[in-house]
Amino acid sequence: MTRIAFWDVSGGHGTPTLVYHLAHMFADQGRRPLLLDLDPSSRLTAMCVSEERLARLWWTDNDDRTIFRYLQGMLPSSSSPPEAKIEELRPGLGLVPGNLSLAFFEELLATMWTRAEDPDAIAVLSVLHRATSLAEQTHTADIVLMNLGPGLGAINRAALLAADYVITPLAPDLTSVAGLHLLGRRLSTWRATWQARATSPPGQLRPLGYIITTPAMALSRRPHAQHWQDQIPGTFRLTFLRISEPATDPSADPWCLGLMRYHPGLRTLAREARRPMFHLRPGDGAIGAQMTAVVRCREDFDRLARTILTRAAELATS
C-alpha cells in the first residue's frame, strides 16, 4: 500500500483536477484507490460529489464521514473514536471528503509542533497518520492519494508526515520555480526535525517527482513559459534532492513523471458531465476533435499513472 501526497506552494496548478483524474485512472486499471481531501477548501470533494450530497456531508451530524470527523474522534482528548466510513464514488474508488472546518486544526497542529517532545503532542501531530490508516484499512485500498492545499501550513506538514511520497504539480512559470525553493527547503527541515523527535509515523517525506501541466497555448508562442519549464529539472534536483546539476529537458528527466496537456475544452465538458475528461462521450458534447482529445487525454493519464507506480516501486527498493 502506497500513500502519495500532492503538494504545491501557491495553488492554481490544477492539483485537485490532477488527483481526481489519477484516482479514476487507477480505478480503471483495476486498483483500489482512496482519495483523502486534506485541503480545507474541499475543491476535490466538490468535484467528486453533488452539491446536495456535499451539504449533507457537512451539516448532517449522523453522516460523519468527512476528514474533520475522523480527526476529531482520533485526538487524545476524544472519548469516542470515529466509525470508519468511506464515500464510495464508484466500485473500487473511495473518498474521505474534505470539510471547511478542517481549518480549525491549523492552530492546534502548529502549537503541538513546538512541543513535539511531549508524547501528547506527538499523538496530535500523528493524528492524520492514524486517520489515514483507519480509512485505508476500511476501504482495503492499495494506493492513497492525498490532496493537500497550497502552502506551508501545519495541516500540510502533518499530512506529509503521514505520506510515503510527495509529488509536486507545477506549471511552466516563475511561481512554480520559486515555489520549488520554498517547498524543498521546508521539506528537508520538517523531515530532520520530526525524525529527531519520533519514529511513528516515520516521516520520510520522500519526493517522488514532479508533474508539469503545460498551458493551452503552445510553448513556442510563450517564450517565457519555455524558459521556466527548462529551469524546473535543475531546480527540483537542487532543492529537493540536494544535487547540483545543470538544467535539462524535462522530457529527459526521470524525476519528471509527466508533461500533461491542459485540455481547456474537455475540462468544461467534464465539469458539466461530472465525470473525468477521459470518460467523456459524444452525448456529453465530446464530438469530432474533442473526441480525439478525449483519447489523447486517456493515453496521457494512463501513462502517468503507470509511471507513478513504477517510480514508487523503484524508490521503495532503493
What are these language model-derived features?
Residues T2-P40:
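Walker A/P-loop phosphate-binding motif and the immediately C-terminal alpha-helix
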Residues I4, D28-Q29, H129-R242:
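Conserved catalytic-core segment of NTP-binding enzymes
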Residues T15, E117-L128, T175-L180, A293-F301, ...:
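Phosphate/oxyanion-binding active-site loops and adjacent basic polyanion-contact surfaces
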Residues H21, M25, M47, A158:
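Active-site signature of alpha/beta-hydrolase-fold catalytic machinery across serine-
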Residues S41-L95:
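Phosphate-binding loop that captures ATP/GTP phosphates
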Residues D63-A84, S188-R206, I243-A252:
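Short mixed-charge
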Residues L75, S79-K85, L89, G94-M146, ...:
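Cytosolic-facing regulatory segments adjacent to core modules
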Residues T199-S318:
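C-terminal lobe/tail of nucleotide-utilizing enzymes
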